[in-house]
């Protein structure tokens, strides 16, 4: 990172000191004294790490002195070396000499203290929250960062943004910026700054218009305005942050082709819904609630019906309501303007505010408990009225839906009572759902507005998401966030080191690729893979009785002890309870699973949601338009096996969104920003060490440093390294001659005493391991100290010598002066000397006059000359000014040209690098694609053959599965049809009731019409008849209700159905009462109308006659309809009889289901509930009947009065003619409706009869299908026996075949030697032929390459001649092209030489010419490379390069002609050798074919007989020859065998209940065993061949390694899954048996209870006859009730609803005791009323008996059949679900076994690769030889034909056989290398495990030592205190003395 000067930093303005150190600070840091050996960081408990100085080292302990003066003794591993002062406040921490935690921490701390909040750490940009405003985001800073590379400017979020923008423009690739961190770390602020930067540098400036033409602001304004709106609804105050984002967001900013903003969109994740209804004390809800109540917009307060005090609303006032740093009033205006800018319509804006206000009102809704019930009811409706008004709902409907939601039971909806707590929970869930859906809808609308439909090409995504969270209480939300960060960290690790390793590859460093993205795979798979945490959570959500405990147990069963990342948490006092722990990359997190199932299902009140969907507010209706309940979803999709999207769990939706996010990120080039919170108190400048270290671990900064340390984090250019470290050994680099910087660096490093494995040389840089650069710095400092000391000594000597010479000169001058002074003192008194003193001055005055005259003349001349020179000077100055201007202009032009040239060179270099990288990538991709295509082709061929081989084995399984699936489908269809029939019959009942109502309405209208006519008496008669019929119907309904009530006593199991019927009947009764009231109102209206229309009837007498006729016709029609209704009733009775017949047939099924399922705990509880409810219903019904009778009597009286009045008014009816004309048309319409209703009744009748007939047909079909199924089972058993006999026959034939093969082998041993000789000759010939063919092929390939190179050079020459002005870029392109071509040609030629050297050892005389040509080609390549280097060094020599290219062209023509000649010669030789080989091979194969095949068959059969006995052991030895894995596989084998026994035992136990599956399971097991034995036989058969195939195919090793590892992991996973499934199967079967036993016991108890109840009823009746009998019967009843209660408590003590059952039973006992007491007290009154009661009872009994005799034969059986059918259908469905679940589990197990076998086959096939074809052909020959053996046994002539056919086929396949043998040798090498690699991996794994165990033991030891040290410190401290006390005492004593 280059350090800028102060002048260069001036462009940043006042932000410069906050971005980079000044030059003065850098110089001071470099000159600061520093001792690298003693300056260290030391681990310290309070401060984590402190700066210290080493005092001494002794025995693994180090004594240090800290900066604070304290002395500490620590272990060596707790001491970390300090970086030199020049690294203080370094801008990129990855460049530090010593990379460790304290170095990173103190670098961040020192930069933070200087307010430099941005720091790089490799690919990361780390930012620390300053908690104050810094001037680093001003416009001049944005301008300063624009277009700057990362290394050219200080670290900043603007630098990251600009780099992403520039990469997008240059690389044409999407970019992403990932901003993570804890709450309060500054993620949202940095996201805003990124958006601000893009909105500044990529502005379009065009304003958008909506349809009305209103300006909505520019796209930049809208992007910026999206933040205030999202913050208002998605941000809240937390403990750490006043403006914390409670959701994650991914903002995509799209750019056009010119780099200008085109559009944007936002995706959100994990909105914290719970904050809507609950906040902690120091927090508050979302900002929008407090903005609304800030009273900035009073009209908003008035519109939302709220107050300005947030404490009036429970949902938003649980914590704080104000934030000092936020002005809610200003924020409201910003939010309001943002809504307008973003283009929301006024209606949508009002809807947003209204829904927000409704959520606030929801929190104030009150509910209370009804008296004597657990049912909730509203406690006031004022708040509900406000909420309903704001949501455009009906308040009564809303309250009813909350307190009495409709729940689907079976096929009908019933009203369910809710407790107060359930209602409050439902209100909270609805509030959260409304808020969440509104938030998501707003995001969608914002995206629609930001989508400008402009052309867009690339985007930059900004991810603002919460960082890793480790709290005291971690729930599902924390798991989701931490899982997201795991995925992001894995993504970063992979990306970071891929870039790092790409640089290694580009620099030519040998490096084995390490994918650090796999480091976190274990934790990620534990969470998201099948049978992971999310999978188990979703599975539990599907079970209605699942609890948190069952979820925890499943987690423990599946993962505890099996996954290293899953642990059981430690119990810590004072800490929240935890259920399991996960080891994440950032630390171990304890999770609490309480309430996870409810959170994941996220249930809502479906009835209220239905109201929302029908709301008049369009926004609310659209929010829930796609919602469907779980019941509706399941019922609507019974036929399908998929879950509907409407019933998607929270975890599934989260994973789907996360996968989309990761897909988006993988398609981009990422940039990483990590935000750090320095302290918890929001204090500027303060930094808490432990807090920051925790975040660095969680954010992956330390993880990134760990990855850096694995590679070569320090790197220096060769020139810089030579200049800086030449001082270490100057003699290593000779002076006076030029030497390359790379060679100089190599010599210099080789001459230094360091570890030479710690550095590598690249093409342009030297790379160092972590710490080595620090060692070089120490050595340089020592060397500099020596040199400076020596230099100082020389300088001091020189200075002293100079000073000495000066002292000598001063001495001589003093001597001279002293001599002259002495002489002057001797002569000064002489007379002549005095005269001399007087005359001397006079002589000088004369001389001075002369001098003055001359000086005046000179002065005048000089003045004239000066004037001339001044004129000339002015002229020259003017010329100089013009010249300076021209010079400056030229300098500016030169500078601009130099800059443009430098930019062009940089771009050219960048393009060259990119081209090199892309060409390398293209080459790798093409090679991979070719390899993958070859592998794919081989795999597809093998797969097809395997499928053909297995198809016959699978046919029976598939047929059986198809037949069983068909039977099951038909069963389901039959059951569905039965259910549909019952539903349709219920619907018909409803239609009949509706028709009866309509008939009544018609009769009433007719009666009213007849009242208007003269024939009023007829009308009165009709009305009376109608009323009598109505009363009869009412009586019938009452009787049916009584009958249903009595039937419910006998049909306890159908409670839900009967309750629904009862409520429907009550509703129909209420409807009838409403109809009667409506009739009364209509009568009153008619009376009023008649009074008004009497005057008009006289004019309509003629019309009256016609109407009377029509009325009579209609009356006749009504009578006909009545007859049809009676007929319909008869048909209905007939249908009910048919249903009763069907019910008898279905009762058998129900008995089986009762035995299988029985009565559940809920049914037993419902039995008890029903007894109390039936008593209550009987009383209610009696009251209802009394009220109904009174109402009917009142109606009759009222009707009689109205008839009397109408009789009086008959004379005045003549004046209603005009009214009757109008009513005539209405009457016609009613008549038409009546006729259509009659037709509908007749159609319904016909449909009912058809359905009855179809039901009968379905029952008969079901019987026939059951018979067919039984026949299929019998066929399967017969087929099994037949297969066993066939197996015996095959074994016998195998023995015979062995004997025959032995005979053949003995008969053909005589010709072995001759065939071996011929074989040897043939092999030599084929080797020579193959060598020539390979040489020819390589020669052709080289010719093609040379031809292509020649064409490219011609094009290059023409291009250079055409465009010499563009010589720079073109020469660079040619340079890179020729470099890559030369490298490729070199590699290819070297490979060709190696192949030729290996394959043509025995035929060197045939390829000497080829080697000579290769050498000439090498020379040509060297000459070409030299010419390319000349072009690269000097651009001006392009003409010379063109001449060289012409010369090369001629040389290539010569080479090409030589190659063509050689090609023709080799072609001729090849054809001659092919002819000879064909003639020889035909003769050879005639003699050889029979023997080879028989010999191969003999060997394979012998190996088969041997290996069949040890197939498992051979397989395990083949897979794991490394040692320990043998034991593991043997354990797995034992587990598999044990699991197989368990499966068989479980299947035998379930045989009684699953007889229809037994045959299928046995058949599948038999076939699996057969397939397994056959595959094992084949594998064992090929063992020896595999031993020969383990020698070659080195390329396959690399691809096969990952495949084998994956197969081993998948096999282990499959074994675990299989074991888990089998365990679940056993548990379910045990539970089924247990449930059967409980069902039988409960059924017996139920029957006993019924008998007891009957006996109790008899005893109570006897009690009415006498007091003594009553006491005795009461005692019996009490005893039996107690017994029954005890039995019920014993049976259902473990169930959750036992307490309620017990309370109900106790209440019943209390009622009974109260009744007994009443009987005791009223004994005398009972005796008096005894006779009356007996008479009443006898009358009631007689009536009841009559009713029962009349109706029980018809309706009782029908209704019983219906209810039984419904219950049986439900129970059957449950059993079928259970069976289907078991079947799915079984199929999964079978599929797992098949997949394992298939994978094993694929692994073996991949290992065999080319040899597989030979194996398959040999297998084909085995089959053919088996046929030949059978034919020989039969002594048939077909054997001869078969032999001839085989001879022909062998001739055709001979060539390929020879190639296959070579492949065998290659595969042998392959397998050997593969096994060696497996062993090395095992050793690495064992070493890693041992290292981890050692580290763990060290940790425990250290922890123990730390505890001991703390104890010793405490003891020492106490001793020190004691000594201090003693010393004080001694001191006081001494002072006292």
Swiss-Prot record:
Which keywords are on file for this protein?
Actin-binding, ATP-binding, Calmodulin-binding, Coiled coil, Cytoplasm, Disease variant, Methylation, Motor protein, Muscle protein, Myosin, Nucleotide-binding, Phosphoprotein, Thick filament
| The protein's name | Myosin-8
Subcellular location per UniProt equals: Cytoplasm, Myofibril
For the modification Phosphoserine, the affected residues are: 392, 625, 1091, 1095, 1161, 1236, 1242, 1260, 1291, 1302, 1305, 1473, 1494, 1513, 1553, 1573, 1602, 1713, 1725, 1738
Q: Which residue spans traverse the membrane?
A: none
Q: Which residues form a coiled coil?
A: 842-1937
Give positions of region: Disordered. 1126-1146
One Gene Ontology term, aspect cellular component: sarcomere
**Which GO molecular function annotations are given, in alphabetical order?**
actin filament binding; ATP binding; ATP hydrolysis activity; calmodulin binding; microfilament motor activity; myosin light chain binding; myosin phosphatase activity; structural constituent of muscle
Name the species this protein comes from.
Answer: Homo sapiens (Human)
Give residue numbers for the modification (Phosphothreonine).
66, 71, 419, 1264, 1285, 1466, 1500, 1516, 1729
